[in-house]
Amino acid sequence: MRLNSIVPDFKADSTKGPIEFYDWQGDSWVLLFSHPSDFTPVCTTELGRIAVNATQFVKRNTKCLAHSVDDTQSHINWVNDIKSYCADIRGEFPFPILADPNRQLAITLGMIDEEKREDIESAKTVRALFIISPDHRVRLSMFYPMTTGRNVNEILRCIDSLQLTDRLKTVATPANWMPGSKVMILPSVTDEEAAKLFPKGFDKTSMPSGGNYVRTTENY
């Protein structure tokens, strides 16, 4: 799935019953992410850390939706291991895990490793991740190999950046940005416009080229 492409509506079984994606999403953002296989070490840590941070996603109006090619009963059994390993998960496991044993959704969303596509019936998904806005568009995607687990803080940071720049369409977030730190004013915004948009001020950095394109503000 390319950025800004629309995720098609789909139906699938999950640990929380059948899901019709568009109805389930409602007006929320969605973190849709795949893992290679249940009952494996890195996947256990990933789903565990996302579950531990469930309230952080709720604060961002973001629903989490896990996915693999295992069946529903496998997911249900595995959840007990995740909760045991991550002892700080309280109560019911906070998000559904989609079952995709026929790999239909995995193929549609391009989650299968290119080297595994010839043996699709036994292929596992890579660690694919999509942040989907309420209009069903893919706003950000990440693809990690099976050997590398994902960073939950980076996922949250990306959601914060997307939601901020949707709200303030004249700014972008720089490298290593964190909520509350400086944002960059887009080059398409003139200094005069920036002064009106950010009346508390903004900073300009002189560049050797003479360009006036590095402007930052904390007042947003």
Where are the model-predicted features located?
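Chalcogenol-based redox active-site neighborhoods
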Residues: 1-220
